[in-house]
């Protein structure tokens, strides 16, 4: 649900300070955890902190889970430990049923833990797609702690996704007021303003503040580069920001993919663009958007249909309900393979995945005319696409009007 740097879970209940990244620091940190547990094998706090360390810094998920379980056995009613274990199950194991069970236990143990309430809300939105319950949990979390900038920002993102732009901006304002130097909050607010194509000067000020707060955030630098390239059309400064973003985190797949798009669309440098696409896929091999973007590049720019189809198939396997990827794959099947039956199957799946996406509906209507000669069905689908565009345009008009009133 996040935009810039917002993980699916808003935070950890960990009591300990995270170690620095160098290996020596990690080794010293691990030794400290081990000594604490040797001194008291039933110290739930130490066990939980060690579990977080093993998952986040060592990637040793089996040992991490063992420590989470020991921590919960030592203190079954510790809401912080339960919440961290739920985050682990959702984010690392992908075990959503067990994660939800543990989130509920954590909230029963302490209904006033705003971190757990916010994490559960993000889980409900991102992993369950239950936006109504997610909104209810965010409301509870913010009632408990009205100044939690992470929860306010995550809730703003949910409201933006639901098209409630006025309330979304209210939450972003509150998040910035609560934590004026938080680069993630500032960057997310800037991206929110950018998506509705308004308040250019405010967007730049927010990005400037975000970068001043965290000059090495790859996601924020890339977000600013997107703004400079797509809205300001300042391509030289945009490329400088993309390069800084890649230097800040050479393994951020989203950043690499955005830079690849810039190199393709603006610089027409297809050799470097493909290098960035490949690096993006290597960095995040199950990211549907990255795979789909590389597939589009392979077929539209290089004309390499075999590799393009491989990427489309991987993208659909990674997320079978991504409507845009399904729609693009359908276009590929019709145009490059002339496999109209499979193309129509993909178009239908795309429309089922998002019945109100005017891009998806428009592509399907074009297919019905060009491949099926079915103008009657195409007309109905175009009507739906037009209605979807009208609703979206009206929502954005209202959002821009609200911005001008502020």
Model regions and ranges:
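Long, contiguous interaction/recruitment modules in multidomain scaffold/adaptor proteins
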Residues: 1-22, 26-28
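Residue-level detector of the short coil/turn that links helix A to helix B
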Residues: 24, 58-59, 93-94, 128-129, ...
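TPR/TPR-like (Sel1-like) alpha-helical repeat modules
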Residues: 365-369, 373-393
């Amino acid at each position: 649900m996040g935009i810039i740097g917002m993980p699916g879970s808003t935070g950890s209940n960990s009591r300990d300070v995270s170690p620095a990244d160098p290996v020596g620091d990690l080794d010293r940190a691990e030794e400290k955890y081990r000594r604490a547990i040797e001194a008291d094998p039933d110290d739930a706090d130490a066990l939980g902190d060690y579990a977080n360390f093993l998952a986040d810094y060592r990637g040793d998920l089996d040992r991490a889970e063992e420590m989470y379980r020991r921590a919960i056995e030592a203190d079954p009613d510790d809401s912080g430990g339960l919440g961290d274990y739920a985050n682990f199950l959702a984010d690392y194991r992908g075990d959503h049923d067990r994660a939800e069970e543990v989130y509920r236990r954590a909230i029963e143990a302490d209904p006033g833990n705003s971190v757990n309430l916010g994490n559960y809300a993000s889980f409900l939105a991102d992993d369950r797609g239950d936006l109504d319950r997610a909104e209810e949990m965010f409301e509870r979390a913010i009632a408990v702690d009205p100044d939690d900038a992470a929860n306010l920002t995550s809730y703003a993102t949910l409201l933006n996704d639901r098209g409630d732009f006025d309330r979304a901006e209210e939450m972003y304002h509150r998040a910035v007021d609560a934590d004026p130097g938080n680069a993630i909050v500032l960057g997310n607010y800037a991206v929110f303003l950018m998506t509705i194509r308004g308040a250019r000067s405010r967007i730049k000020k927010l990005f400037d503040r975000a970068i001043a707060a965290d000059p090495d955030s790859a996601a924020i630098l890339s977000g600013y580069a997107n703004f400079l390239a797509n809205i300001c059309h300042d391509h030289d400064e945009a490329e400088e920001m993309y390069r800084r973003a890649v230097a800040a985190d050479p393994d951020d797949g989203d950043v690499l993919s955005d830079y690849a798009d810039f190199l393709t669309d603006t610089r027409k440098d297809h050799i470097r663009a493909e290098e960035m696409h490949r690096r993006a896929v290597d960095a995040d091999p199950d990211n549907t958007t990255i795979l789909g973007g590389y597939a589009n590049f392979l077929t539209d720019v290089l004309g390499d249909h075999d590799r393009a189809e491989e990427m489309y198939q991987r993208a659909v396997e990674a997320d079978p309900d991504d409507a845009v990827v399904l729609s693009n794959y359908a276009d590929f099947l019709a145009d490059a393979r002339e496999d109209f039956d499979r193309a129509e199957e993909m178009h239908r799946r795309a429309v089922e995945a998002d019945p109100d996406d005017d891009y998806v509906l428009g592509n399907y209507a074009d297919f019905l005319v060009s491949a099926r000669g079915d103008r009657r069905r195409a007309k109905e689908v175009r009507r739906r696409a037009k209605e979807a565009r009208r609703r979206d345009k009206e929502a954005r008009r209202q959002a821009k009007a609200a911005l001008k009133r502020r």
